[in-house]
C-alpha cells in the first residue's frame, strides 16, 4: 500500500496521509478548514516492515483502507510547570 504524505501549512507538525494522491475530498470539510492548504512531502510504501517516525504503520494502513486518509497530529508535551497538582 502506498501513502501520500502532506504537511499542513497552517498547523505545525501536522500531517495527512492519503491513499490516493491529491484526493483531499476524503478529508472532512471541518478538518480541511483548519489545516489546508497542504504541501506534498513524500510518497511512501507502507509495508509491514516499514517504520514511521510518529505513527504506527499498521494503524495508518488501516485508516487509509477504511477512510482514505490518516491524520497525524503533533505530540503534546506537558511541562512540570504547566501541571496543576492541587
UniProtKB/Swiss-Prot annotation:
Per its record, how is this protein called by name? YcgL domain-containing protein XCC3997
Q: Where are the transmembrane segments?
A: none
Q: Tell me the ranges covered by the YcgL domain, including all copies.
A: 1-83
HAMAP family xref list: UPF0745
PROSITE patterns linked to this entry? YCGL (PS51648)
Quote the PANTHER family the UniProt record gives.
Answer: PROTEIN YCGL
Q: From what superkingdom does this record's organism come?
A: Bacteria
Q: Which InterPro entries match?
A: YcgL-like_sf (IPR038068), YcgL_dom (IPR027354)
Amino acid at each position: 500500500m502506498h501513502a501520500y504524505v502532506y504537511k499542513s501549512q497552517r498547523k505545525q507538525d501536522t500531517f495527512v496521509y492519503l491513499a490516493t494522491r491529491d484526493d483531499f475530498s476524503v478529508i472532512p470539510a471541518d478538518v480541511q478548514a483548519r489545516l489546508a492548504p497542504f504541501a506534498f512531502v513524500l510518497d511512501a510504501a507502507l509495508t509491514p516492515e516499514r517504520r514511521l517516525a510518529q505513527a504506527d504503520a499498521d494503524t495508518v494502513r488501516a485508516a487509509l483502507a477504511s477512510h482514505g486518509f490518516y491524520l497525524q497530529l503533533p505530540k503534546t508535551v506537558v511541562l512540570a510547570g504547566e501541571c496543576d497538582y492541587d
